[in-house]
Amino acid sequence: MDATLIALGALALSGALATVAGCAEDLESDVGSQSNPNSQVQLAPQMGNIHRYFNKAISGEPVSYGLYVAVAGTVAYAIMQMGLNPILALILGAGVAAFVHGAYAISAYLGRIVGQSKNFGQPVYWDVVMSHLGPIVGHGFIAVFCMVLMAYLANTILGNPFPLPLIALIFGITVGAIGSSTGDVHYGAEREYQKYPFGGGVPVANHGDIDIKAEYGLRNGMDSSYFCSRLGGVLTGLCFGLIVFLDGWRGVLGDILKGGQGGSVITASIISIVIGLIIVAILAIINRKVEVFARNKYGPYTK
């Protein structure tokens, strides 16, 4: 089969995996109140809001997911060097990363909550730990497995020269940054502040004054994940999927347009860079058009 068709197929699969990974990563961070919402949940007891959120963030998502995916990639790489099946190795690597993720989540939650118990009266809810740990580890396993499989495809089929653990680390940092900047805003600036008028942002005076009541009963991280699965998680997945697909597509297109095997690598690289700049310019124009349309349609926020 033609190598270009194989590369395009691997690229399409990588884009689909990236979409699933981005969505799962954002929903996992919503269950655990990591990144954007983290500081608001941390401040809530100091503002008199005793809550039932799971708060597991010691670091930002780029650092933590860089760790998880790098662990999975390193374990999978070591197992593959022993001669085991690559798919089995990737599954085992993601499984080890899931255990690391679970230990990290529990220690972070208990450390943060216990630190606030004495001075601010925030109790440790053990049922919150047990009910939230499964979705956190489960969503994390899905995200990590998809990304380590993407790293394997990039290394074996798409011709990436870097070793599997390093590619996995880069993918983990990337998805963490996207989830933090794209999806978590839906939770940290909207879901946690539904009692305030929409569109006003989060003024400093309101920091920590989060919603602690749900539609029925007290709110927790599971409610937030359900809410964000309709928009924040989807947007994170689409963003990561488009980045992976478009970046790989411009590389494949550069190889095609260079003139086959007779073209030079430098020519292919220049073509890929030009295509990338064109894509960035088009996306910037679309972003500006959407922003102007939204401001003209809904007007500035007043009170």
UniProtKB/Swiss-Prot annotation:
EC numbers, comma separated: 7.2.1.4
Coiled-coil intervals: none
Transmembrane segments: 3-23, 63-83, 86-106, 133-153, 157-177, 226-246, 266-286
Pfam families, sorted: MtrE
Its membrane topology: Multi-pass membrane protein
InterPro entries to which the protein is assigned, alphabetical: MeTrfase_E (IPR005780)
Entry keyword annotation includes DNA-binding: no
Pathway: One-carbon metabolism; methanogenesis from CO(2); methyl-coenzyme M from 5,10-methylene-5,6,7,8-tetrahydromethanopterin: step 2/2
Subunit relationships: The complex is composed of 8 subunits; MtrA, MtrB, MtrC, MtrD, MtrE, MtrF, MtrG and MtrH.
Function: Part of a complex that catalyzes the formation of methyl-coenzyme M and tetrahydromethanopterin from coenzyme M and methyl-tetrahydromethanopterin. This is an energy-conserving, sodium-ion translocating step.
Family note: Belongs to the MtrE family.
Protein name in the entry: Tetrahydromethanopterin S-methyltransferase subunit E
Organism (species): Methanocaldococcus jannaschii (strain ATCC 43067 / DSM 2661 / JAL-1 / JCM 10045 / NBRC 100440) (Methanococcus jannaschii)
